[in-house]
């Protein structure tokens, strides 16, 4: 491939969006039917399944770019 830095996902935008909406992580987790372990993965910027991300976006009425970003691995 391109030989550049490996990219990782960061979910900081999701946490900021929740703050802006006055919502707790637990409220979102329950609303979208996600497990505690899935939200632990989000908190550690680990991979989660696409259906989980789709449910979050649908509930928050936003797009993927509003809740996550791809950054070089050394910035995660």
Residue ranges of model-derived segments:
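A short, Lys/Arg-rich alpha-helix, primarily the initiator
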Residues: 1-26
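DNA major-groove recognition helix of helix-turn-helix
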Residues: 42-43, 60, 71
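Recognition helix of helix-turn-helix/homeodomain-like DNA-binding domains
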Residues: 33-48
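Short amphipathic recognition helices of helix-turn-helix/homeodomain-type DNA-binding modules
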Residues: 67-76
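The alpha-helix within a helix-turn-helix
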Residues: 18, 29, 43, 57
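DNA major-groove recognition helix of helix-turn-helix/homeodomain DNA-binding modules
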Residues: 52-66
